Structure formats: C-alpha cells, structure tokens
Amino acid sequence: MSLDLPHPIVLGRSGLPGSDGLIDLTDYDARQHGVSRRHCILERRDPYLVVIDLGSTNGTYLNGDRLAPQQAVPVSSGDRLILGTLHMMITFHERASHQ
C-alpha cells in the first residue's frame, strides 16, 4: 500500500465506506489480526513522520517495542510497524518532480 500524507491519517478498520481520514485495513484481514477500528495515527511533524497509538486493544509496535498510547514516536524508512499482529514495513520514497 502506498500513502501520501498531506494530513494525519488513521490506520484501522471500518465497515463504513469513505470514513474520513481512515485507511481501512479490512482487506488485509485486520479484524483477524486484532486491529482496532481506530488503531493508530500517522502524521508529519516536520522533519519527522510519527506514529501515535490511539489506545488500541492489541497494541501498536515499532521495531518490536510496544508504543505507549497517545505518545508520538518518530518513524524511519525500514521500520517495522505492527498493529495487533498485522505486520507492515515503512518505506519512504522520493516524490517524482513534475516539470
């Protein structure tokens, strides 16, 4: 999955199509992996990208460390993010310049 982050986004699951600001992980078996409806937020806090756990039931982990709820933690390219038991790898890509 590829994301552009002009504003904060929530990672989670929803039964409602088009939930504002929510990246719905249902297609990745989110419920079976213990992903909460509003699990965590990814947002830019220049010069960083941060992840914030939203008090999820099954936890948010960054590189194996469980995040405390409501604490912003910087994320780097190559980091492993786990929501419940759903594993992801964070990779940054340069934007193509349009000339």
Where are the model-predicted features located?
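N-terminal beta-hairpin/loop module of FHA
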Residues: 1-34, 94-96
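Short coil/loop residues immediately preceding or within conserved phosphate-binding loops
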Residues: 20, 37, 46, 70
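Acidic side chains
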Residues: 22-24, 53, 79
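Short beta-strand-initiation
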Residues: 35-37, 76
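Buried hydrophobic-core signal for structured, non-transmembrane domains
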Residues: 40-42
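ATP/adenylate-binding site constellation spanning eukaryotic-like Ser/Thr protein kinases
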Residues: 8, 37, 56
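Short aromatic-glycine-enriched beta-strand elements
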Residues: 48-50
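C-terminal boundary/linker segments immediately following FHA domains
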Residues: 11, 44, 55, 61-99
